[in-house]
Amino acid sequence: MNDIEYILRSLEQLAEVDIDVVPCVYERFFAACPEARPLFATREAQAVQGKMVNELMQTVVDRLEGKPYSAVMVQTMVSDHDGWRVRIAMYDAFLDAFVTAVRDALQCTETSPEIIAWRRQLSMLRQDIAAQLATSTAPV
């Protein structure tokens, strides 16, 4: 199996066990990055949490499937967060919180193929985010 197959399988498993990882992602994210909590203080900001997690999953899948617009998704992601002064450390904390929440929800280990695939793909996404941040007005 390759990364796309492992990642799609993990998403199917999450659906089968009917676990919403969003609260777990943000619990871990805020623990690792408490300075981000005030950015989600409004009801509107809290409402987008699920959207952000879903967009992350979709972006990874789209990149793996070679969708032509996937590079634009990363540009949009960084641009959308520019005004919030989101730094690379916040992206790092969010990506780690996501994969850790998936790992725990699926009761996997760090060495399971699904988690290795997620970490590899999120690492590549992080590189693209960092490159995009370098050209934006947000602090790195």
Task: Describe these PLM feature segments.
Residues 1-140:
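Globin-like tetrapyrrole-binding proteins
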